[in-house]
Amino acid sequence: MIAARYDMTAEELVGYEIPGKRVELVRGQLVVREPASLRHGELSLRVGVALANHLAREREEQRWALTRGRLATADPGFTLARSPDTVRAPDVAYLSRERYSGPMPEGYPELAPDLAVEVRSRGDRAGEVLAKVADWLSAGTTLVWVVDPAREVATVYRADGTVAVLGLDDALSGEALLPGFVLSLRELFLAE
């Protein structure tokens, strides 16, 4: 991770690219990250597909005109703080209809997703991951799932401050946010 030394705004970050890199803004500082690994992308996709399938099933069973919420993958940016600006980008984000029901905006909306999913990369330092979790929770995110492929565990951080570390015999749960959603970690990691 590389951080620039000048203040930048969320608006300046829109359209800012460094070929082959991922960028975030943390308290006005540009943070440049390496591209995600294939394994990282695969796990992000599996979580996203499981959530999308759950929402589609729920909509079909309940015949809702609208889904319960919106789902986004591929590092969607959210403006979590201003002056200095922080724009974080989870691997997967879910926004409930209660939190956000309008059309998807251009740029980075000033809100936090209800669920943020972070898949750890090999180069991620524990302190950096915890700082991201703290940013999500302080901005109003209800659940943060940190998926750790190296250890084959997932850590669940909740808005009420509770934390749970889940192993291969456990499952991620949508809890009250996404009732009925369950994703086995053994299935997620394709463990034997």
Language model feature labels by segment:
Residues 1-192:
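Gly/Pro/Ser/Thr-rich low-complexity, intrinsically disordered segments predominantly at protein N-termini
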